[in-house]
Amino acid sequence: MTSLLFDFSAPQSVTLWNPINDGVMGGISKSQLRYDPAGHAVFTGKVSFENNGGFASVRCQPGDLGRKDVTAYLLEVFGDGKRYKLNLRTDNSFDGVNYQVQFHPTAGTWTTCRLARADFLPSWRGKPVPDAPPLDTSRVRQIGLMIADRQEGAFELAIRLIAVETV
């Protein structure tokens, strides 16, 4: 069964998403999640390595995004050839453990990326957290998109929806 978390077909769909870029560490990368009148959102910006930077992200405001028995997260996206991460947080805090998985959508075409629950790994500021508990999808409070991993320059990921697949 599939359950929709975010449908980006309307302008108000992006209002709960905020940029969190490497400026928190002195960097100058920029990003935003904006609405495209074609009926989807666009995660766009520029990653810069200046001032020890190197990542850009957007995150939704905390809310009840938890679902039981999740087997995968589904993203319908139009890629630009770059690698991205989906971040999940199980609390309302700004900083702390993130459960993340990388995805590499096909460039130039709409595709559905299926991100298996088992592939989400706990990390803190990009470093593994081996002693963190496994992801409990029923406790998810925040969802985010990120670009990092030494990918300098402009980026643009169009996104129609984020959903969950459950048993």
Predicted regions and their residues:
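Beta-rich carbohydrate-recognition modules and glycan-binding surfaces
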Residues: M1-V167
